[in-house]
Amino acid sequence: MMQEESSSPVSPVDSLSNSEEELDKQQSKRGCRKRRSARKSPEDPDSPISVKRNKKASSTGSSPQSFEELQSQRVMANVRERQRTQSLNEAFSSLRKIIPTLPSDKLSKIQTLKLASRYIDFLCQVLQSDELDSKMASCSYVAHERLSYAFSVWRMEGAWSMSASH
């Protein structure tokens, strides 16, 4: 058997003698979640875990990866994660520009999402109401300013604080 088949999140070269309990202990020390036993039997080839391991074992060959290869993979994973985080932050920045906010608002990501959801609900209410005529519903700058003002008033009246707790 190959050493790769029992890859642990702690060390890529753990021996096969590590039991699942030992792996769980190692994961709990690192703050990781326990793995679920998704397989019905260890021989089940349709298991997501065994498919992943088979793919990994076949791509690396019979020798364990060198330290340099592992370090290179880690660096690449860090680069991908940094790019993903940067992309996510840029998306939140764009969302914050779209949502009408008060000058004093410094919104966290979760607050931004909740406020965006409330703003969408508010816009749906505006569209469904007969209060606005067709001229005001156009996408002009004045209409946008009026909607922003109406949303700010709506927030200040307490509708935001009541609905944000959901």
UniProtKB/Swiss-Prot annotation:
It is found in: Nucleus. Subset of mesodermal cells. The keyword Magnesium does not apply. Induction: Expressed in the mesoderm and the neural crest in response to two sequential early inductions (mesodermal and neural). Pfam families: HLH. Its main location: nucleus. Residues 72-123 form the bHLH domain. GO terms for cellular component: nucleus. The keyword Thylakoid does not apply. It comes from the Eukaryota. One of its GO terms (molecular function) is DNA-binding transcription factor activity, RNA polymerase II-specific. GO terms for biological process: developmental process; neural crest formation; regulation of transcription by RNA polymerase II. SMART domains: HLH (SM00353). Residues 1-18 have a biased composition (Low complexity). Keywords: Developmental protein, Differentiation, DNA-binding, Nucleus, Transcription, Transcription regulation. Coiled coil: none annotated. Probable transcription factor, which may be involved, with other proteins, in establishing the pattern of cell type-specific gene expression in mesodermal cell subgroups. This is Twist-related protein. The lineage of its organism: Eukaryota, Metazoa, Chordata, Craniata, Vertebrata.
